[in-house]
From Swiss-Prot:
UniProt xrefs under Pfam families: HD
DNA-binding region coordinates: 22-90
Protein name: 3'-5' exoribonuclease YhaM
Originating species: Listeria innocua serovar 6a (strain ATCC BAA-680 / CLIP 11262)
GO MF term (any one): 3'-5'-RNA exonuclease activity
Length: 313
């Protein structure tokens, strides 16, 4: 099978077509301009520097451009980085398209939509069900296309809905174990907790933060959406208030972006399973490219830790 970007080890030479996910201009200590690039294919992404750039390079090697390059995989502060030796823009004659370089969820969109719909169907609280169903219908196209984040976890096409499906399965297991859990509230919280990402983020290709994402953030966005849809549906009362609390508190702490800590059991569960699913996704991503008996590269989103891949099964 043809090797992809993250299949290469430190010290190996790479010659590949890659998609530019981000491109940021900087100035080196010698005063010369350079570009910090994030390059990707279906296996994942790596950072690279393009030195001594000209004005034309900023256009030729901008976001969403496909490039053919040759370079070396290096270790930079515990993480792989690509040192570029040669680079050029892809041409129509190369016969490559952006979709070839974008990682996608391991479950197709139709299957995920069917599974999420089943969880909504099982909800017995009419108000929570109506709010959840209405918001998902309003944003369903983007919900099933968008990543769950710009970097770190589930940062691929349909990553948002895959994250939700994984969390719903965890939520069901927790509710089966603890019968005092309000399944309807927990399921609604899981389905809606990151819905604001469809406004916070620009989309599945070369994802960046929108103006709303930078200034408001997905937590405040989804709480506002719940308020609006509840008013449209003439729903008020405690369910709306508690659902908004569950969504507001799902990051767990103020320093992590939540204005309130979890103060109902479903909010605490949502926070814990969100953290679990995101953490395991990040770990799986690096351990997939780590040989048994070795440590992974450092994972910034997990306190910059390296993880060990055991030799036994």
């Amino acid at each position: 099978m043809e090797k992809r970007l993250l299949d290469y080890e430190v010290g190996e030479t790479v010659e590949l077509f890659l998609l530019i996910k981000s491109s940021v201009k900087g100035t080196a200590s010698n005063g010369k301009p350079f570009l910090s690039l994030v390059l990707q294919d279906k296996s994942g992404e790596l950072e690279a520097k393009l030195w001594d750039v000209k004005e034309s390079d900023e256009i030729n090697y901008g976001v969403q451009q496909i490039v053919h390059l040759m370079g070396d995989i290096q270790n930079y502060r515990g993480r792989k980085q690509l040192k570029i030796r040669q680079i050029r823009q892809a041409s129509p004659l190369d016969g490559v398209s952006a979709s070839e370089f974008m990682e996608t969820a391991p479950i197709n969109k139709d299957e995920m939509a069917d599974e999420i719909t089943q969880y909504i169907f099982e909800m017995k609280n009419a108000n929570l069900q109506r709010i959840t169903r209405a918001l998902l219908k309003k944003y369903q196209d983007d919900f099933y296309d968008y990543p769950a984040a710009m970097r770190h976890h589930h940062e691929f096409v349909s990553g948002l809905s895959f994250h939700v499906v994984s969390m719903l399965r965890l939520a069901k297991s927790v509710a089966d174990l603890y019968p005092t859990v309000n399944r309807d509230l927990l399921y609604a919280g899981v389905i809606l907790h990151d819905l604001g990402k469809v406004i916070e983020l620009s989309g599945p290709v070369s994802t960046t933060y929108t103006l709303e994402g930078n200034l408001i953030g997905h937590i405040s966005i989804v709480v506002e959406e719940v308020s609006k849809i509840a008013e449209e549906l003439s729903i008020d009362g405690e369910e709306v208030v508690v659902l908004k609390h569950v969504l507001l508190s799902h990051h767990g702490k103020g320093e992590w972006g939540s204005p309130k800590p979890p103060l109902v059991r479903e909010a605490e569960i949502l926070h814990q399973i969100d953290l679990m699913d995101a953490s395991l996704n990040m770990m799986d991503k690096v351990l997939k490219h780590t040989k048994p008996g070795e440590f992974s590269e450092r994972v910034f989103g997990l306190d910059n830790r390296s993880f060990y891949n055991p030799t036994f099964e």
